[in-house]
Regions:
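Carbohydrate transferase catalytic cores enriched for Leloir-type hexosyltransferases
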Residues: 1-166
Length: 166
């Protein structure tokens, strides 16, 4: 929440009755469209590569951000049932979305190739980080940090996961 600069026209909406993980997943896939229409939402942005079923028929415009298609390029890293679900959601999303945001040129190419999407529906918007991470520290502070953590003069910091697919 702290990453979003809220305006008076924005608000967070959560499922009222979906307390369990399964119920929340069902709400995100089916129930949310009813709530969006009831609340007069005119634009929905799916941030995690999927859109709710029926969003196009609802008349609500939609945008989806797709980060990658690893589950299609390397299904061996996933449970086969997950791959089936992700594929189904991906193809539905490709049909339903008014616009698609790809986070890289490679992802955009994959969406065209694997999803049959017209490239004119895709915008490439590279990810970045907030300005609070752009602070340049003094040489003394950097030296102190290297000493504290016993780091060499030059090193690569990876804040990713140790999963093989990443």
């Amino acid at each position: 929440r702290e990453q979003v600069n809220m305006s008076q026209r924005m608000r967070y909406v959560y499922p009222k009755s979906a307390k369990s993980g399964i119920a929340q997943a069902l709400w995100r896939s089916w129930g949310i469209v009813r709530d969006l229409k009831k609340d007069g939402v005119s634009l929905y942005h799916g941030l995690s590569g999927e859109l709710p079923i029926g969003i196009r028929k609802s008349g609500i415009k939609s945008v989806v951000t797709i980060h990658d298609l690893i589950f299609m390029r390397h299904p061996e890293y996933y449970n086969p049932i997950d791959v089936m679900m992700y594929r189904a959601k991906f193809h539905l999303t490709c049909r339903e979305a008014d616009r698609i945001i790809a986070i890289s040129r490679r992802t955009a190419e994959d969406i065209v190739e694997l999803g049959g999407v017209n490239p004119k529906r895709i915008d490439i918007i590279y990810q970045s980080c907030g300005v609070r991470f752009a602070n340049v520290v003094s040489e003394e502070a950097a030296d102190e940090t290297r000493r504290r953590y016993n780091l060499p003069e030059r090193f690569v910091l990876n804040v990713g996961t140790i999963e093989e697919r990443k």
